[in-house]
Each structure stands twice: as structure tokens, then as C-alpha cells.
Amino acid sequence: MQDKYNHTEVERAAHAHWNANDAYRVTEDQAKPKFYACSMLPYPSGKLHMGHVRNYTINDMLTRSLRMKGHNVLMPMGWDAFGLPAENAALKNGVPPAQWTYDNIAYMKKQMQAMGLAIDWSREIATCDPDYYKWNQWLFLKMLDKGIAYRKTQVVNWDPVDQTVLANEQVIDGRGWRTGALVEKREIPGYYLKITDYAQELLDHVQIGNEKATLTGWPDKVRLMQENWIGKSAGVRFAFPHDIRNAAGERIQDGKLYVFTTRADTIMGVTFCAVAPEHPLAQHAAASNAALAAFIEECKKGGTTEAELALKEKEGMPTGLFVTHPLTGEQVEVWVGNYVLMSYGDGAVMGVPAHDERDFAFALKYQLPIKQVVLVDGETFDFHQWQDWYGDKERGVTINSGNFSGLSYQDAVAAVAHALAEKGLGELKTTWRLRDWGISRQRYWGTPIPIIHCESCGAVPVPEKDLPVVLPQDLVPDGSGNPLAKCEAFLKVDCPCCGKPARRETDTMDTFVDSSWYFMRYCDPKNRDAMVAGGTDYWMRDQKAATGGSGMDQYIGGIEHAILHLLYARFWTKVMRDLGLVKVDEPFTKLLTQGMVLNHIYSRRTAKGAKDYFWPHDVEHVYDEAGKIVGAKLKNPAESGDGLLPVGTPIDYEGVGTMSKSKNNGVDPQQLIEKYGADTARLYTMFTAPPELTLEWNDAAVEGSYRFLRRVWNFGVKLSAIDKDAALASVAGAASLKDVQFGKEAKALRLEIHTVLKQVDYDYQRMQYNTVVSGAMKMINALEDFKATDSAGAQVALIEGFGILLRVLYPATPHIAHVLWDELGYAGTLGDLLDAAWPQVAPDALVQDELELMLQVNGKLRGAIRVAASADKAAIEQAALASEDFHKFAEGKAPKKVIIVPGRLVNVVV
């Protein structure tokens, strides 16, 4: 056994053993309780970052600890391999996205293997593999057949220079990220999935306080985010009648402008209506109004998301059209508003400036009437400044509302809804913020949508026997539109219905499709005949009786995926259930959203106003007298936009933030592993903070983790020098420990080890891995402090204690634990550490012969006494009064009273 800890040699030996034994291959074993633990699959961007290291180590600790406890545990891995970054890299480097993607996968896989993760690589998938995305296409066709998938027009971001559609994240300040051209909005056809058909069930299962909720193992924050995204709203949908006619003399939209509101109590305060730029009334008015037409064109610039529109300045223009208020008969002016989305509701909203903050600002800007119709007792309305109470529906009472005056919110809504229904112009209605999922992307690197367009037959599904529709692997995007549209070999095909020449659909699927079911494919990764089968039934089976949930037992990933990915995966699972493919309602029983990894951020403005960022290792902090960081300066020369900056140059300190390439505050896991070893990287990311909280990087703490592992190794070296055979035999047969004569010190060591083990076991169950590591540190402290003797009992206590420590540490630092376990002979008696039984707390070790009680004199701590564990009050009092500490601090005074707190302290009042 080497005297000094060499992480490179230790990790090489551990990997050789695991590889030789195919240690992590898992099969379905009905004799064991199953546990499926999965991290969200990564995008193969090129290198792992510390967030990956933290996520996968959490998963690995769970996997290894449960395997030791007798579970059949699956920890798979794959690659979310389609997507825009590969196209961007191809555009930049002139290589096909496939080549860039697979090169990155190979490198990142090596990094994961270096971490020592217990991944079953036989189940590895890549979503860009035709054997995988074939089933995206297959299920899409099933959805099409069931009416869940359908085709309609959609508004997209269009770059007029590149002649291509841009994702929302590619639109920067209203311009295309590559060309800088002003982005336009265009309506183009695309395929949608009816996620709204599942809105109620999606809400029921996630909603806090709902009796139908099943996702009680999810963080409340995520559940609330999903509930808000689904956005169930109860209100009134009603119409403003009109007589606006098109060129053919027909009333537009049957003479009714529909809106939806949750504030029907304010209907008497309507002073305008606003419609989306694409609304039929807006288009009709623009046909004879050049200024309005120009405004509508201007509205097409910029992004299409609700979030982006919320941040834009609200602008509008009158159409010159009027509709009729359904209850008062007054004429209401129609405006075009850049903040109204055609895809939400009916593409129109009622304007009630007095009681809606957005409408209030709009009315002030364009000098529109403001009519107060709700009053909160004791408040005064100011027509020049918004006050929060204007929108308060809980305390408000209607005023200036004719027959509807003097009503509470609930009563007013009911009365207004009844009046509108009697006129045939409205009804109570539930609406959802959730919209059908548009999956068409005008991109190359994605799953081809299996549709053929024929002039005679229309849009024809690709026959199942012809799946997959394989994406060409060798195309290189040039920035001028979708390469598939120019690839004749892909594009040209005969119609499967009539046999005439036709063309393939060139849109590809949203990459969220790929990640909506991959966790099921891990269960049957090589099945060429079915999307899912027996493996999925086993790993995703209903475990309600045992765990209170169903599906995957534990899912781990970032909270940034709280809405889209997790919501789409839930929807996809429910569709697969309804198609008879799976038997579960929800995909993930428990969810852990691990915290971000943060680091210090340092920057400096250049002479031209640009911002340079500097690596933390080139910077040192400047502190004030109280020790607070007040600035920073360079401790090494560093390049900047102003040239090479010398040591001592002042630098701006921005605090801590998420590790980022753009801010030069990331830490390369590869460099960390090479310098300190994978075990140190793993240990540090687990010890520094609880898994669900953010982790603030600290180089000194990394060094501390490495020193701790050296201490463990050094203790193992000391232990290797003693004769351990008899002690190992005793430890291997737990029953025989009862026959071992433990001395006072050995009993104290066992008490400490087993007390800590009891807490560590609980912490493992809670996935509080930071306190698991703290417990391991307490164990090594106790072992190092133990004054070993040649007695058999002392050696057994040492061997038992260190064996427990190695098993406690193994899930966190498997390499060093494995090598020490082997070198010290534990494997020969207790078996390979891979499947060694989890250590059990020994009840006899927790039984104390003696107790240490704190001694107080007149309430002040003055020392301690030791008494027999069975000592009664009289014996404890006698020991206290006889102690040196009492006589020293009593100063000859007689005791008046002795107060005993059992198991803790004795207070003598003199």
C-alpha cells in the first residue's frame, strides 16, 4: 500500500476494477426493490461544467447508497443532442452539426467516466440517433391520428436577411443575433399538440392543496410555477356587437368582438377595446388607413413571446372603428395595441383604465377616458396616478354602474354574467394561460416531421413502415435558411397515396419533444420493435403502495426546467398512457432541483466602454476595516481591451453569480480532477451546501476537501501495519462482536462512530449529503483521537469504525473508499464494496457505561463529572459534591440545593 495518497493511481485502480467487472450494468430483477434515479440529460456542448459535476454526484451518491441497502438501482445517461447550438457551431466552423455533436459526446463521456459515476452505459442514448427519433415520429403520427396533433398557422420571428426563422432567444433587442436585421413577425403553418386537452389533469396532479394532487414529492416552488403557467382563470367571455362589414358586405366575425375578462365587475368602466395587429378588425381598418397599416407592420418587429411583450412599451393606434357596449349601448372605440397577442384568447381585450394598471398607463398616454366603477372605502381616486387599490377586487364595491352598483366582486360578476347571458352575448367561462404546444421548427438539426406534401393529396403522413425519416448527416448550414429545403435527396419523394412526385416536410420538431420521454427509452434502449416495453413497465411501474407515487423514483435537475421540460414530459407521459403504452399517470415521483454553482465576478470597463471580465485566479480582494469586500485588484497581469494590464490594476467586484463562460468565472472540472482527483471534486460539491441550495465556490475549501481525503488515506496506511485478520473476522460476523471485550476507550469510540452513523443514515435518506460528509469528518476525528492498544477489543473497534467510515464515504468518494477497502482486507471478509451491505447501527454500541455531566456552581459552568450510566440522583449528587471542581468554585460555602437535569448537567447552588 502506497504511503502517500496519489489520486491518479487510486482512481486508475478503481476504474480498472469496475470496468473489469462491468460494475454498473443493471438488469430487471424482480427479487429486489427497484429504484430509478435519473439526472436530466445534458446537451453535448463540449465540456462538463461544475453544475454537471454537482448534479451527477448527487445522483451517484443516491445510487450507490441504495445499492448497498439492497435496491436494484438504475442510473442511466444520454445526450439531448439536437438543437440550435450545433447549427451555430456548424455555421462558425464549417462542419456538419452531426460531427460537432458526436465529437462533444465522446469528450463529455470521458469526463463523466473520470468522475467515477455509476452509470449503466449500456443504456446510453443520443436523441439525434435515428433509432431514437424514429419513435418521436411514430408517436407524432399516433397523435395525428387521435387528433392530438394538428396543423395551423403560427406567428414566428423572421430574419429577412438570412431568410430564416429565429428562436426567441436569438432575437436581441428586436434584431437577429447574426445579421443584426430588424426581426419581423410572420404567420406560417406549423404543427401543434393539444396539451390544452390535458390542462385540468396537469393542474390537478401538481396543484398544492388539491385533493387529486400526486406530485407531493416535488418542491412547492416548482409546483406553484407550473400551476401559474397552466394558469386556470374563471371569468366571463362576452361580445361587443358591431355592424362593421368587409368588402363583400358581410359582418366581420358575425358582428361580434369577443373578449375574456376575470373582472366582469368592471365592465361598466370600459372606455376602449384593443385588438392584436393580426385581428380581422385591425386588418380591415388598415386596408384603408396607411398610417395604421404602417403601425401594424412596425408591430411585427421584435419577438413573439408573452414575456417580451410585457417588457415592451405599450403602444397603440385608433382604427376609427367602434363597437357597442353590450350593457349600456354606448359606442366604444377600437384600438390596435402592440401588447395584445392574437394567440391568446380572442386576440382582443377590453380597456378599463380605472382598474387595470396597463390600461391606466395606456389611457394616460393617449388621453383616453378613465371611468371609475369600483370604490374601496376610505380611498380617494386620483386620475393622474395609479394606486394599487384601483385593482383590488377583494375590498372593492361597484359604483357608477347603474343597476350593478353597490355589489361586491363576486356578486357583481354573477350579476353581469347573468345579464350578458340573457342578451345572448356572454357566459361564464374557464380559460387557461396554457397554449397548445407548437412543435414545428424551421431548423435543420432536429427530428424531421414525418409528413409528405402532395399537390393532389395534401399533407400525407409517412407510412409507419417507412420510419424513421432520416435526417441527412452531412449538411452544413450557411445561414441562408433551412438546409433541408435545398437538399433534393431529402426533399423529393413519391406520395405514398397516389405515387405522384411530392416533397417532404422540411420543418423539424422542437427539441423539447426529444426530452419529453427519453427517461422511458433508457428502460428499453435497444428495442427496435417498440417505443417502450417490459423494461419500462419494470422501472416506471406504479409504486403507490410503497412510495406514494408512480413512475421514476427520483429526478434531478435545475429549476430552470421547472416549467417547459417538466410540463411537456408530464403531458407526453399522459398521452402515452392514453395510447396504452405506459401504466403511469406521472413520470417523476420525486424531484430535486439542485442549486446553482456560483463564483465571484470581476470586471472592468475599457476606454471604449466595453466590459472585460477577469478570471478569479488573477484577482485579489480589497477589504475595509470590518473585513468587508469593497473592491478588487489584479494580482497577475491580465489581457484586456486596453492591452495588458499590470499587477495592482483596480478591478470592479460584482459579487457572486452563476458560473459562466462569458464572465470568466467558471471552474473547469477537468483541471480540478487532474490537480486534486475526482473524489475531491465530488466531495467538495457535496460538502459545501445542501443539494437544493446554491453553492458558492471557494478554492480554499477545495484544498480542505483534498486534505481530508489525505487524512483518510494516512489513517488507512497506519491501519495496514497492524494484524487485522482476527478483527476483520469479528467484524464480518456481527453476532460475534457481542463476545468481544471492549475497554473503556474502545467503547467510547464505538459510541461515537455508531451515534454518527445513526445520523448519517438519516441524512442519506433525506439526501442531505453535506451533513453526511460532516459525519464522515467526525468519524475520522474520533478514529485519529483513539488511543489504540494491543487489546483485541481496541483493534476490533478500529477495524469496525474505519470500515463504517469507508462505507459512509463510498457513495461520495468511491475511488479512495474502494482502494482502501481492498488494500485493508475488508473485501475478503465483507465482499466487494460495490455491493457491501450498508453498515447497521449496533444497539449495544449506543449503551454507555458512564455518562459525562456538566457541572455548574450557581448556574455557571465550572467543569464536568463522570458517573455510571445507571447512577441514581443520590449517586450523582454525591459525585458532584465530591468533585474537585465543586470544591474549587464553592470556596468553602455549603450547598443549599442540587438541581439535576438527567443526562445533561448538575447545578449546585451554594
From Swiss-Prot:
Main location: cytoplasm
Motif ('HIGH' region): 42-52
GO molecular-function term, one example from the UniProt record: leucine-tRNA ligase activity
Keyword Cell cycle part of the UniProt annotation: no
Gene Ontology biological process terms from the UniProt entry: leucyl-tRNA aminoacylation
Enzyme Commission code(s) on record: 6.1.1.4
Binding site for ATP: 661
Pfam families tied to this protein: Anticodon_1, tRNA-synt_1, tRNA-synt_1_2
SUPFAM superfamilies: Anticodon-binding domain of a subclass of class I aminoacyl-tRNA synthetases (SSF47323), Nucleotidylyl transferase (SSF52374), ValRS/IleRS/LeuRS editing domain (SSF50677)
Family as reported in the entry's similarity comment: Belongs to the class-I aminoacyl-tRNA synthetase family.
Official protein name in the record: Leucine--tRNA ligase
Gene: leuS
